[in-house]
Amino acid sequence: MDEILYKENCLPSNVAQSFSTNIYRLGYIIAKDILPNQHKNIGCVPDDNTYNSVQMVHRVYNHIDQRPQVNPALEPMTYALNIMVEGFGYKMKDVLRLKVNMLQPHPDFKPGNYNTPHIDDEKMAEHFVLIYYPIDCDGDTYLFNEKFNKLKKPEKLTIHKRITPKANSCVLFKGNRFHASSNPIKSEMRIIINCNISLLENYSETNRNTEKDPFKGTNIEGKD
């Protein structure tokens, strides 16, 4: 699968309502979009439009964290993930990482700026990224044409598509595509649920099954 899939009304209304309410009840920690010491990594490509801002994060799950504690949000989020992935005609294999990111306006963040373009995991570039938007806000997700190559950074990034957050919508794309968030300018906050997943091996863009899609509004955009 090497396309960008976008869907509105991607969850049943009761599930979407639960997310849009409970994201305000989570405990968040202060973090950077990308840490300063990561900017030289081959999976990060800052450019003249980059503004690296502070964000608030609620971490739900990371596959490399073997501590026995389980975040109570993991089960309902995994349930919702399965609905969204199957709505695109795929089957999810594993959840690799789950977190909630919150960005707020910054006085130095200008229209056309974005946070550091990156891939989420340089060691697992074959993963998939699903971003769920629980609320309406500004602060587009930037998806670039360029893909990760462990031997060479792209010299320049070109924008393929911008996704404006719309409540109860999601976007799915392969994890080797460079992407970036952007801070809201008009809204008081931008909240998204960021998911890294793997798909079952026998599901590819050639056998994607949408016949049983229970929701309307599937669009296939940006097919390479």
Name the predicted role of every residue range.
Residues M1-K91, P214-E221:
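Non-heme Fe(II)/2-oxoglutarate
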